[in-house]
Amino acid sequence: MGNRTLEGCHVDSRMDHLFPPSLYIFVIGVGLPTNCLALWAAYRQVRQRNELGVYLMNLSIADLLYICTLPLWVDYFLHHDNWIHGPGSCKLFGFIFYTNIYISIAFLCCISVDRYLAVAHPLRFARLRRVKTAVAVSSVVWATELGANSAPLFHDELFRDRYNHTFCFEKFPMEGWVAWMNLYRVFVGFLFPWALMLLSYRGILRAVRGSVSTERQEKVKIKRLALSLIAIVLVCFAPYHVLLLSRSAVYLRRPRDCGFEERVFSAYHSSLAFTSLNCVADPILYCLVNEGARSDVAKALHHLLRFLASDKPQEMANASLTLETPLTSKRNSMAKAMAAGWVAAPLAQGDQVQLKMLPPAQ
């Protein structure tokens, strides 16, 4: 399949060849090592039968796949929005790039709901917080998002304009089917999970306020972490979806109006690049803030430094592997909550819960 040459809008590609690639390079440098550490820490959480680790692991995998596409997008922007790697790579890397946005939002929503169940209903919904359940939910997330965003794989995604720019996965103005797909992405892929996160945060606040025995410092930690879930989605993804919705709505009303597309072109590309910061925020917030994962990462760094400083690296590597053997014994739902850094323990009367952030059981 060749490129399609179309009479498109006159967008100035010279305006955004600095900010997006600079931000992507930063995300590669910071996000790649932190997500590798986050993936390892999440794996250890899964080995300890902690369902939160399943969501963290899937989130890290999605972020790493996304980061692998960034070098080509850096090249694309440095060439002033000119894709030189062929139609096949455009489809593949564009599909991974854009689908990751909604996979990440979905898993952030899963984590938020899981934290709500752990804090507000630690015993009542214990079955929903098993590793098997988390694996099943994660499979549904991947299947749903990959399927819902697969339409571009069956269309040409390279567009050459009259100024000899070869756009990949973007056309100005957009096509009709793309506009309708964007509405689905905004309302179902972004707003719906964000609304669930808001409801989960509200439920967490109620549970924390109703626990008279929970220490004030613990309440602050719980509320901060829950609020950070919402903030990541809002800060990283909201600007992009506001412009995506605006572009789609304007096209559906005035399909041939290029004025709006030309005015928001630079802002749209900047907001799209800003979504990549999610790959930096995810491991820092959900692994390094989590007591169990933070402990695992600290141990990994400690043994890595000892390994690099040792005169007998092989012996140190063997010692590290021995020290880092994960627990394999089965844990009940309360122990899993402790491993995740959250615990909700019934008091003697059974009517209230005491919430604490604790390190994972060793």
Swiss-Prot record:
Site-annotated residues for Proton sensing: 155, 165, 269
Sites carrying sugar chains: 3, 164
Cytoplasmic side: 46-49, 122-129, 211-214, 290-362
Disulfide links within the chain: 9-258, 90-168
InterPro entries: GPCR_Rhodpsn (IPR000276), GPCR_Rhodpsn_7TM (IPR017452), GPR4_orph (IPR002276)
Subcellular location: Cell membrane
One record GO biological process: positive regulation of inflammatory response
Domain of life: Eukaryota
Keyword Membrane: yes
Similarity field: Belongs to the G-protein coupled receptor 1 family.
Name of this protein: G-protein coupled receptor 4
Biological source species: Bos taurus
Lineage: Eukaryota, Metazoa, Chordata, Craniata, Vertebrata
